[in-house]
Design a protein with these regions (language model features):
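Short coil-to-beta-strand
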Residues: 2-6, 80-81
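Lipolytic serine-hydrolase domain surface
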Residues: 17, 167, 173-287
């Protein structure tokens, strides 16, 4: 396989149901749409869903059930707020030794990455598609792994070390909401260190947000993020009756224009993978992805 693609979900209760390919239900329509658009090239791409909802879903849904008979209005909105704030506050890293939720979520992500690695080689370029809170989670996961890596290097298994990370597409991403507690904001190092020059030339962190999505934000205005995020794309998503409403937050997965955007980027990476080793040019200094993390922060 020439390319590995991992998909991570965001807020909301997600069933832990998988198809014969091991894909969770939230990812199936998007993966099917990408395969249709890629045609024969789809055979060069391995997909894997990353699932973490089970860590928090049971607690949130149990509470919602307990308040069913209470005199509460706007229940659909209250449910959405509970699931988002419940996921966000439950996931936060705390110092209490007994609270391991942060580590549990990351272990679920790690398990998905390992399942993907079992299908591809250690040098395979990796693309991560991250929705909503999943963008914050995967950013933290990559950050923690990069701390373990200490210095950029090509280890025995650079894929598991996330040093073959060639693409990151965040959509409906709310990373900015988690930065305001810090005076200095530092992004992950991007792209990975172990990429061929041709793949590195095409490496991109792309951020997509629907203008009506109250949980999707531009990333480049964040301190230091313009050095690693290549594009903030405002893209209305969903059918006409949701496209200009907050409901658009859940519509990226099913939107044809978003599918086209993703497929176009995957094609560029696949084409770069066809170039001989050593082909292509390195990103010149000053372009996103070329400056060491130490220079940014």
């Amino acid at each position: 396989m020439k390319l590995a693609v991992a998909l991570i979900h965001g807020i909301g209760d997600q069933p832990d149901s998988r198809d014969e390919d091991g894909l969770h239900s939230y990812a199936r329509e998007l993966v099917a749409a990408l395969r249709r658009r890629l045609g024969a090239e789809a055979g060069e791409v391995t997909f894997q869903s990353l699932y973490w909802a089970s860590v928090l879903d049971a607690r949130e849904l149990d509470y919602l059930k307990r308040i069913e008979r209470e005199p509460l209005g706007w229940r659909w909105l209250r449910r959405a707020v509970t699931l988002f704030l419940g996921d966000a506050s439950g996931y936060r890293k705390v110092s209490a030794a007994y609270d391991t939720t942060y580590q549990q979520v990351h272990q679920h992500v790690r398990s998905g990455i390992m399942a993907l690695r079992a299908k591809v080689g250690p040098q395979t370029p990796l693309v991560i598609l991250a929705h909503s809170l999943g963008g914050h989670i995967v950013s933290n996961f990559i950050w923690d792994q990069q701390k373990l890596n200490r210095t950029p290097s090509c280890s025995i298994d650079p894929f598991l070390g996330l040093e073959t990370l060639a693409g990151l597409v965040t959509f409906g991403c709310n990373i900015p909401l988690f930065t305001f507690a810090y005076e200095k904001v530092c992004p992950i190092r991007f792209p990975g260190h172990c990429l061929t020059p041709a793949i590195r030339q095409q490496a991109r962190w792309l951020n997509v947000y629907a203008p009506a999505d109250p949980l999707g934000y531009p990333l480049r205005p964040l301190q230091n993020y313009a050095a690693v995020v290549h594009e903030d794309l405002a893209l209305p998503v969903g059918p006409w009756y949701k496209r200009h409403t907050p409901l658009s937050h859940m519509e990226y997965w099913n939107d044809a224009r978003f599918h086209d955007y993703l497929a176009d980027y995957l094609r560029r990476l696949l084409a770069a993978g066809l170039e001989p080793a050593g082909a292509g040019r390195a990103l010149p200094a000053g372009e996103p992805g070329d400056r060491p993390l130490a220079e940014l922060c």
